[in-house]
Amino acid sequence: MALLTNGKGFIRALEKSGSLAVYAPLEGGFEGRYQRRLRTNGYHTFSLTARGLGDVSAYLMGVHGVRPPHLGKKNIGQEAAVGPVYFVPPIAAYQLETLPPKSKGLVLWILEGFILSQTELEYLANLPTLEPRLKVVIELGGERYFSWKPLPEVIKVA
């Protein structure tokens, strides 16, 4: 059980700053270990990739419209020329609503965060101040060992 009780420095840093930039070895495996450590400390984790997020604020915290691919079929005169709009609930806000009462909060673990723009990273760094039960971990690149830094510090350097 010692494997599950380690990682307290990571959890303390996440609770202190609210958002972390993570650098993990490219062969993988470390993400699952640290997510398991978060879950044993009372957090719920939600993994998603940064590719295809679109408007990060709308996708995570607001109801947003999505147009599915039309696949060559069009309804003439009934809908918009670009197709119907389906409204999707916000991913993070919905997960926060369904958290158990004894949970410490929700950790969004975002893969491939290196493709996000500076503005999107700033929004994700400020998101825990808007919603205190929400923490953010973004994988920003590879390293020979698992390391992390507070996301606001990484944004200031860039």
UniProtKB/Swiss-Prot annotation:
It comes from the Bacteria. GO terms for molecular function: oxidoreductase activity, acting on NAD(P)H, quinone or similar compound as acceptor; quinone binding. The keyword Transcription does not apply. GO terms for cellular component: plasma membrane-derived thylakoid membrane. Belongs to the complex I NdhN subunit family. NDH-1 can be composed of about 15 different subunits; different subcomplexes with different compositions have been identified which probably have different functions. NDH-1 shuttles electrons from an unknown electron donor, via FMN and iron-sulfur (Fe-S) centers, to quinones in the respiratory and/or the photosynthetic chain. The immediate electron acceptor for the enzyme in this species is believed to be plastoquinone. Couples the redox reaction to proton translocation, and thus conserves the redox energy in a proton gradient. Cyanobacterial NDH-1 also plays a role in inorganic carbon-concentration. This is NAD(P)H-quinone oxidoreductase subunit N. It comes from Rippkaea orientalis (strain PCC 8801 / RF-1).
